[in-house]
Amino acid sequence: MVQEKLRFSTRTLQWKCVESRIESKRLYYGRFILSPLMKGQADTIGIAIRRILLGEIEGTCITRVKSEKIPHEYSTIIGIEESVHEIFMNLKEIVLKSNMYGTQDASISFKGPGYITAQDIILPPSVEIVDNRQHIANVTEPVNLCIELKIERNRGYRIKTLKNFQDGSYDIDARFMPVRNVNYSIHSYVNGNEKQEILFLEIWTNGSLTPKEALYEASQNLIDLFIPFLHAEEENFNLEKKKHKVTLPLFTFHDILVKDKLRKNKKEIALKSIFIDQLELPPRIYNCLKRSNIHTLLELLNNSQEXLLKIEHFRVEDGKSILDILKIQKYFT
């Protein structure tokens, strides 16, 4: 009995990518395995990771359209083969890749005749087109078509509102889901006297990220969900091992920078003009700060660690990571 417990406690779980391929610019496939698992664990992990992959991975898409030539959504435009509704559906399918936060503007300015494709969209620097050949409309006559677009990064699926906006813009259904499909299967086997399982996981993405990247983000999101339970245990039971942990005292980032003196070259750093996008923060930390409306280095430095720890999913270790990054990038010495 003791030997069985020892064998179980020393087993090492391992992920492995057993197949990866690009079927098209907008369809990536990956197949992964996780083993060895105890009986029942594969189904638990499979259900959880599938839900996270399909519902909580952030994506970027076009969410709103505006043009003077559009009287209403179900109208037609002279000189354009597609109806307005068909153009909206084509814009909905455009696959975008970005690390932006919130909403940004884009536009199309096209003079016919010719085919309007995704490459004709004028995008902000932080957004990329995955497939430039995606069709939008066929302009059959020498007419000008100007369209203003809103681009947003979010998660899940959002159905358009039925009412029109006062500025004449129209919502379109927003599918922020970069993961197209997820399947999992379980292979059971016997190892000695112990029943074990292998979890097989198949992931298809739209090309804005790879299946491996999607799996990493989903795993991190799942881990973050359980962090509060770990913190609660530390607070309520005051575990002995907590004495041996390296923890950071509560401080204001700005106070530390003042003590260490802001690094200067020829001019003092304009903290307001340094955005956290430039700091190369880990995606999870970056998203935590953005969701709390912390956009610049100055806004970050004016927060104490106590205030940052109130941010959902922000951990003590994240504060240390930020300080390390600021030191590496020489914002202070």
Swiss-Prot record:
The enzyme's E.C. designation: 2.7.7.6
Alphabetized InterPro entries for the sequence: DNA-dir_RNA_pol_insert (IPR011262), DNA-dir_RNA_pol_RpoA/D/Rpb3 (IPR011263), DNA-dir_RpoA (IPR011773), RBP11-like (IPR036603), RNAP_asu_C (IPR011260), RNApol_insert_sf (IPR036643)
GO biological process, one term: DNA-templated transcription
Reaction(s) the record says it catalyses: RNA(n) + a ribonucleoside 5'-triphosphate = RNA(n+1) + diphosphate
One GO CC term, this protein: chloroplast
Alphabetized UniProt keyword annotations: Chloroplast, DNA-directed RNA polymerase, Nucleotidyltransferase, Plastid, Transcription, Transferase
Enzyme's top EC category: transferase
Location(s), subcellular: Plastid, Chloroplast
Stretch list, region Alpha N-terminal domain (alpha-NTD): 1-233
Segments passing through the bilayer: none
GO molecular function, one term: protein dimerization activity
Known function: DNA-dependent RNA polymerase catalyzes the transcription of DNA into RNA using the four ribonucleoside triphosphates as substrates.
Family: Belongs to the RNA polymerase alpha chain family.
NCBIfam families, A to Z: rpoA
Subunit relationships: In plastids the minimal PEP RNA polymerase catalytic core is composed of four subunits: alpha, beta, beta', and beta''. When a (nuclear-encoded) sigma factor is associated with the core the holoenzyme is formed, which can initiate transcription.
Record remark on domains: The N-terminal domain is essential for RNAP assembly and basal transcription, whereas the C-terminal domain is involved in interaction with transcriptional regulators and with upstream promoter elements.
Protein name per the record: DNA-directed RNA polymerase subunit alpha
